[in-house]
């Protein structure tokens, strides 16, 4: 019987694409909180390449770093889930909802080649415009791109 924990393929020195859905549309404050929560492990546990927190889903691409204590890569599910849990608890406290606004499961995929990388990166970058959240992707405050002038 399926109980909600799908297996996730792992490999070293690869780029991952991850997306997860939200139980309900997130408001501006919640989207910014999730963005900050996912940026927190950047540079230590992973190298975040692009991140878009949209009202109904979140999409990101990154490379996982090795844990200094073990020499093995961090578990990507742990990184993403810890950020979701931390932000989810804060949202529950503020909204008095019973459950965090994100589903537990996420979809992840190893990016196989440069063409797939470019396709997925561009789709994430274009998502705020295609969903009519901003006139230009650069204007959407919950889109983060590595090495962009405003990336912090």
Regions inferred by a protein language model and the residue ranges of each:
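Short catalytic/metal-binding and nucleic-acid-binding patches
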Residues: 1-152
